[in-house]
Amino acid sequence: MNKKKCMILALAVLPMLNSCSDWLDPKPLSFYSPENTYVDAAGLYAALTACERNMRHEFFGDGAPILTEMYLTDIAVHGKTDESGSLVDLDNEMLPSRTKNDMKGKNKWYWEEGFKGIKYANIAISRLDGAEYKDEAERNAVLGAAYFQRAYRYYKLTHQFGDVPYLDKEITEPKLDFYSYDRWSILEQCKKDLEFAYQWVPEVQPRGRANKDACGVLLMKICMAVGDFDRAIAVGKEVVGRHPLMTGRFTGNQTKPNTNLMHDLHSVEAKIDMSNTEGIMYVVAHPTTTPLDKDNRIYTMRNALPYWAKGGAIKTPDGKTGTAIAPDEADKNTEIDNDTKYGRGIGTCRPTNYYQYEIWGEKEKNDLRGPFNHDSWRRMEDLRYNDPGLKKTNNPYYGQNLIRPVDLSVADSIRCWYMWPHYKVFVPDPTKTQDLQGGETPWYVYRSAEVYLMMAECYYWKGDATNEAAMLNVVRARAGAEPLSGNIGIAEVLAERARELYYEENRHVELVRISYLYAKTGKPCEALGLSLIHISEPTRH
């Protein structure tokens, strides 16, 4: 009887054993698996959306990565000198063993997020031929957009880290044998890819996605990096032909007092205004398109403004605590409410004397972008003594403008007392009533103003000072600065970039690119009186 039962059980199990392989064959549980997603242009653009999101994160948030690109140049320093391990002591903190991806610095962020962007772009590139398209133009537009995203990362990585691994396809299995490639070869490949992208990516794309002229701007940068200045100029002329500068007041801000064209150009309204011809490429955060969280707030006021609310740092002339985030309740949203009028900063990104003073001379007296214009820039003396304790004690300084202390300490002058470009960094946050630090907004990645400055630099390398000045003067004229003429060089290009592109450009990347070009071309640097002969041989000093 037991034998019979065993035979029956065995016969019952046999079919199950035969179907075992079917049980173990994994089936995707999600409609969004790669096999179900990357089947058409829309699916592949979804992969590139991850690239666009990471582009936004470079500019947004407390201690945004773009600040590290500013600390490592002539326009800003890390203001938190009281925080150990921050990017203040560069000799020790920029070593390979001291990589950072926190509030103290973000050099590691560029490495990690750079290769993440390359990974997402390579997914679209590798899966391109497995999808269906309505025509060749749609296919090539997707490929061009992916090429843009990959080149966007490699342009930065090759100038931040030099020779790096080059990945040109999706990695689908564990891989440990990565090797660095020559940076020049990587840039040449990116140039080839971007020529394709510039041909095929449409001129009109949804805001936040790379369009034809965004591809053109990046192509210009890479042409400049490899020394092809004529091609960069040719592309630049085409781009500015399609994207003229905004030279007249626009947006609803034009009716507000104490504003000018620069306030219009850098307002939230301007960056969502489809008639804004100057904007070429944006990263996008807006309550209608992105979740409301700290990663989607720009935090420009927190990062760039002085730490005016630091306890005890700002005192009245009679020695009392002078400022507070919130004034007396009766004085909220008035002239003495520094928080709502200017924003609450913590002095993370402190502008240098070069950016505050040295680049603003007699020719910039009427420049709308500079500190001579008191609507565009703010000083600590514009703020008010507003600590509620002053009002309670009937202190006569309550509500008065700040007075520079005669005994201002070095520490306080670094983090708590300096000028700043209010027009550029003031971003309202309608979701908050206090502690305003910079809300949601689109942000410029590329503008045609930069294209003119890039063409000016190309003419510098070609030794054509006349056209160099002409390109710079297009941007200067719009801002109200006097024209440049005569013997100008790289210093004028870099000063104009600082005036125009604060908190927009990857200035460290651009300075490294220029350094490589001096080495590649052998052209003497007139700004420092240096040439290749000073550095090319170990015996020379």
Predicted regions and their residues:
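Membrane-proximal, proline-rich intrinsically disordered regions
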Residues: C20-T68
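Short, surface-exposed recognition loops and adjoining beta-strand edges that mediate ligand/DNA contacts
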Residues: D62-D82, E203-L218, A225-G311, A481-L494, ...
